Each structure stands twice: as structure tokens, then as C-alpha cells.
């Protein structure tokens, strides 16, 4: 019972932080709508609709798969295998997110013309594609820290990510975009991308500081595919239904 209490309290902490971030994010969106107007908000929503689908496809179930594989190794007291787990998950994530990002970057003009119906979103979609692999790799590290029960650390990084996104977005809006809808949309995507870079850097640095033992290479690929591919398929189908 004593061991379960920290897990319970950390789960409460993560839930509370997520609720707080949602409240802050909603308030920030309301403030943005006043700054950039209805046209800017409409453009942002169009980009985020396509971006969310691309993100789901790029993540390809890797966050949950990383969490599952990490928890399995820790449960069997094999911390020496964590380096191989993370390296394989990183390779999978880079392959999937890189493929999706390339398709989004090259296909942005076609999507803007034939699907979205607004060519102003092309620069924002391409900028989103540039940052997409970073966002997906952050999902790998988030899954690892969740499985390792380092919820407090993850919550602190998520708060810092939200604050960084807001600061970068507001600074670029006031210094460059003004009331221009296309530039405002770019600022929002830039804020999210920069904050994802900060998050990935922080989580990788914290992981390196752990200095866990390294063991012999183990077969991870099949286990990863069995965990990630079904999740990826279900997530993509659900996201396609909600987007269309």
C-alpha cells in the first residue's frame, strides 16, 4: 500500500497539471483571437486540423509503445535494456515522422489548393512539417518518463513547454506578424515547434543524466511493431474520421 501512494499522488499531479494547461491554453486562444481576429483564428484552425492528422500519423503509436516496452523492462528488472529500447523507438519514430513530414512538406500546395481551399496555409503547413519529427521524438521521451514513473519531472517539462510556446508566439506576433493572418498562423506554428525542441532537449538531457547501465543488444523490433502498428492504425482512422 505504501508503494502505491506515490503512484497515486503522481497520477493526481499529472491530471492536475494537464487540467491547468488546458485552462491556460484555452485562455491563451481567447487572447489570440482578440489579437489576430477571426480571419487569423480561422486560418490557424485549418492548419491545426491538417497538423493534428499529420501528427497522429507521424507518432504512429510510438508513445504508447515506448511506455509499454519501458514498463516491461523495468518490471522485469532489466534497466540495462532501456538504451536499446529507446534507440529502437527513436529509429522507428524518425522513420515514420520523417516520411509523414516529407509528404506534408511536398504536398502542402496540393492540400492547400484542393483540400483546404486556402493557399495562405502553405507556409504554415511546411513549417509544421519541419518541426513534426521533433514533436514525435518528444512523444518517445514522454512515454519513457511516464513508464519510469517520473511524473513530476514530466509535468514540470510540460509546464515549461506551454510557457515557452506562449512566449515565442506572443513575441513573434508583436514583433513581426501584427494583424496579418498568414504571419499570425506562422507564429503559432513556430511557438509550438520551438517549445517542442525545448521539451525534447530537456527530456533527452534528463535521460542522459540517469547514467543507467548498458547491456547487450536485444531483439526489440518485432515487439515494437506488435505494440505500435495496431495503435497507429486505430489512431489514424479515428483522426481521419474526426478531421473529415
Kindly give the residue locations of the regions a language model identified.
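Small-residue-rich midsections of specific transmembrane alpha-helices
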Residues: 45-74, 89, 93, 100, ...
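N-terminal membrane topogenesis motif
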Residues: 1-24, 80-87, 218-234
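Transmembrane-helix boundary and interhelical linker motifs in polytopic inner-membrane proteins
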Residues: 5, 37-40, 54-91, 146-153
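Alpha-helical transmembrane segments of multi-pass membrane transport and lipid-handling proteins
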Residues: 87-114
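Hydrophobic alpha-helical transmembrane segments
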Residues: 156-171, 179-209
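Membrane-interface junctions at transmembrane-helix termini in multi-pass inner-membrane proteins
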Residues: 134-157
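Alpha-helical transmembrane segments of multi-pass membrane proteins
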Residues: 102, 106, 117-141, 167
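Interfacial/gating helices of multi-pass transporter permease domains
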Residues: 32-53, 120, 185-186, 223-227
